Amino acid sequence: MADVPGAQRAVPGDGPEPRDPLDCWACAVLVTAQNLLVAAFNLLLLVLVLGTILLPAVTMLGFGFLCHSQFLRSQAPPCTAHLRDPGFTALLVTGFLLLVPLLVLALASYRRLCLRLRLADCLVPYSRALYRRRRAPQPRQIRASPGSQAVPTSGKVWV
């Protein structure tokens, strides 16, 4: 078996054994693909949650910057028909004041959603690509002598 960079020599019965190089390469590609898919789903979920919760503050800031005479001097009908500069200033101030609490709320809801979906459990470490697990040895059953009765033990010790 060829040496795998970063892999340790396995002592028989000591732990996981290194994979073959081709098997290691294929597992590394699959692990990378799975981790990239999980990361893309995380990013999509983050954008969806942040976009939904921060929408009121972003809308206020957008109209405030778009219609205030100090910034873009837009003469669009929605800007001139409804508010003047003091109203757009109020939109800017309210948007900035709402931004931080809504951001905290959005990040808390994203964290809760990630914990509920257990997305961190979907990430696979690269050590799984380099090493293959050994099967745990089966426990040997002790046979009772023909004349004695076998008493089932639960594995608990009462002291």
Curated annotation (Swiss-Prot):
It comes from Homo sapiens (Human). Its main location: membrane. The chain crosses the membrane at residues 43-63, 88-108. The gene is TMEM88. Belongs to the TMEM88 family. This is Transmembrane protein 88. Residues 137-159 are annotated as: Disordered. It is a multi-pass membrane protein. One of its GO terms (cellular component) is plasma membrane. GO terms for biological process: negative regulation of canonical Wnt signaling pathway; protein localization to plasma membrane; protein stabilization; Wnt signaling pathway. The keyword Transmembrane helix applies. InterPro entries: TMEM88. The keyword DNA-binding does not apply.
